[in-house]
Swiss-Prot record:
The lineage of its organism: Bacteria, Pseudomonadati, Thermodesulfobacteriota, Desulfovibrionia, Desulfovibrionales. Hybrid [4Fe-2O-2S] cluster binds at H239, E263, C307, C393, C421, C446, E480, K482. Keywords: 4Fe-4S, Cytoplasm, Iron, Iron-sulfur, Metal-binding, Oxidoreductase. It comes from Lawsonia intracellularis (strain PHE/MN1-00). This is Hydroxylamine reductase. Binds 1 [4Fe-4S] cluster. Binds 1 hybrid [4Fe-2O-2S] cluster. The gene is hcp. It comes from the Bacteria.
Length: 537
């Protein structure tokens, strides 16, 4: 085992015995084997595409398979083995469609066993540390992009060109069936692929936003209660709004109340979801606090995506859906939540109403574009001096209190936009108002970075200037691979001066880091006081 794809990797180097996330050496190895199988599949898919052969089901499978290798998504070795076997079957399907002769003497499961004996891991990328670093940036970016592409596809939104790039990225640096390999491309070539990944991720997030809006309505500013309501209860964590919608439909009229958790908070801002009266509030904070929070919740919990941690203390109350999995946890297939609902009826629920603070969410792209005249007038008049986007992933590693302190110390003449689970460091803070604008504006989930970028771009166009000329600064926290893909999107869009923390990715080589500093002005966070002063110059 040698895994360094997340921010909390051991000693800021790599996990070698067991993952900080909880994955075993066996699961880590299976994930490496799955990536290997997907790279082989990618070559077959590209060859088929060259002949005009596209199989949408295999495209969807590919992003689904990449998604399960993200941090804190799926820890079930049986599930990963089935994906490896299906990747082999899909590769042979492409070969047959191209008219190639297939050796069927080896069954897919036997090929899986053969792959299991192969050495895999980080050292397989490239012997040159810089090329190795760029290849890792590309792979982790592809994983994040695939997560968003998966969510978009579930809502009926996809783009053949997006899948084609994912195949191209997977195939890069890996030998095709004739043994040809393009690993020896230059670092500049690798970085070009990395930036193209950022552009592809922008497209994936665009598709997802379109799917969410068409399915659930345009997000609007909405009050959300942090209190509890007497009665049976189900907690929904993750990011998949369709899973939440399906559960709301199936629990309507049952007397069971639904609470959001983690990055499900912005769901309350979507009109079609908010219309369900038994979607009563939000419970808990970010993913790393789930052991304490879930153990106190008097009902079952549904994990629709990452981040799931070892639920051993309450495993009988945990259910998963979609790509998420943990050994021994009940999985809800095909949108059927009957067993989850049965468990909710068995558990006590909340015994009484508990009033809680109310906060605002649902400030999507359209809300801020509608407020653009107010924002621009405030900037021109000097009332609004600066806009900070403070968002990204939260985590357990020390140093993340920086973000709550940053927001608390942001001057009264500034506005803080936020998104992702990083907001839970300060989401319940009352920062007051600037005129008619709240000083703390929750734009949504991590994928709503697309909306934030569109808003900033629109402001720049109105002011006839570049994005980097605006009084806007990005202060980001990262943890897993979706954050990597978003960072690549920002780089591809030419956004400069990003502050990143709490630590820099261990897979980024010193030379590439210097390139990012030189070309994009990326810098590690220091202290809130120093960074605020510098960014407001």
């Amino acid at each position: 085992m040698k895994c360094n794809q997340c921010e909390q990797t051991a000693a800021n180097d790599s996990c070698t015995n067991i993952g900080v996330c909880g994955k075993t050496d066996n699961v880590s190895h299976l994930q490496d084997v799955l990536i290997y199988a997907l790279r082989r599949l990618a070559h077959a898919a590209l060859s088929a595409r060259a002949k005009g052969i596209i199989v949408p089901e295999i495209d969807f499978f590919t992003v689904q398979a990449l998604f399960i290798t993200l941090t804190n998504v799926n820890f079930d070795p049986n599930v990963i083995e089935r994906f490896i076997e299906q990747a082999i079957i899909n590769r042979k399907t492409f070969a047959q469609l191209r008219g190639c002769k297939i050796d069927n003497s080896t069954r897919p499961i036997e090929e899986v066993k053969s792959m299991m004996s192969m050495p895999t891991g980080i050292d397989d990328f490239h012997k040159d540390k810089n090329n190795c670093s760029a290849m890792q940036m590309l792979l982790y970016g592809l994983k994040g992009t695939s997560a968003y592409a998966y969510h978009a596809a579930v809502l009926g939104k996809d783009d053949p060109n997006l899948y084609e790039f994912i195949y191209e990225g997977l195939a890069a640096g890996f030998p095709d069936r004739e043994g040809n390999i393009d690993k020896e491309r230059t670092l500049s070539d690798w970085m070009d692929l990395v930036l193209r990944c950022g552009k592809s991720n922008l497209r994936a997030m665009e598709l997802l936003e379109s799917g969410n809006v068409e399915s659930f309505g345009v997000p609007t500013s909405t009050k959300v209660s942090l209190g509890q309501k007497k009665g049976k209860a189900i907690l929904v964590s993750g990011h998949d709004l369709k899973d939440l919608y399906d559960l709301l439909c199936q629990t309507e009229g049952t007397g069971i109340n639904i609470y959001t958790h983690g990055e499900m908070l912005p769901a309350h801002g979507y009109p079609k979801l908010h219309a369900f009266t038994h979607l009563v509030g939000h419970y808990g904070t970010a993913w790393q606090n789930q052991h304490k929070e879930i153990s106190l919740f008097p009902g079952p919990v549904l994990f629709t995506t990452n981040c799931i941690q070892n639920p051993k203390e309450y495993i009988e109350n945990v259910f998963t859906s979609g790509v998420t999995g943990w050994p021994g946890v009940q999985h809800c297939k095909d949108g059927d939540y009957s067993k989850l609902i049965e468990r909710a009826k068995e558990l006590p629920g909340f015994s009484e109403d508990v009033p809680g603070k109310e906060l605002l969410t649902g400030f999507g792209k359209q809300s801020l574009l509608d407020a653009a005249p107010v924002i621009l007038d405030s900037i021109k008049s000097g009332v609004l001096q600066h806009i900070f986007l403070v968002g990204g992933c939260d985590g357990a590693k020390p140093g993340r209190n920086y973000y709550s302190e940053f927001v608390e110390k942001a001057p009264d003449n500034t506005v803080v936009l936020t998104l992702g689970c990083g907001k839970f460091r300060f989401f319940d803070k009352d920062l007051g108002m600037i005129g008619s604008l709240p000083r703390l504006i929750d734009m949504g989930q991590c994928n709503d970075a697309y909306a934030a970028l569109q808003v900033v771009t629109a402001l720049a166009e109105i002011l006839d200037c570049g994005v980097n000329d605006l009084p806007v600064s990005l202060v980001l926290s990262w943890y897993e691979q979706k954050a990597v893909s978003i960072l690549l999107t920002l780089l591809a869009a030419g956004v400069k001066g990003i502050r990143l923390g709490p630590s820099l990715p261990s897979f980024v080589s010193e030379d590439i880091l210097q390139l990012l500093v030189k070309e994009w002005g990326i810098a590690p966070i220091t202290t809130p006081d120093k960074d605020i002063a510098l960014l407001m110059q």
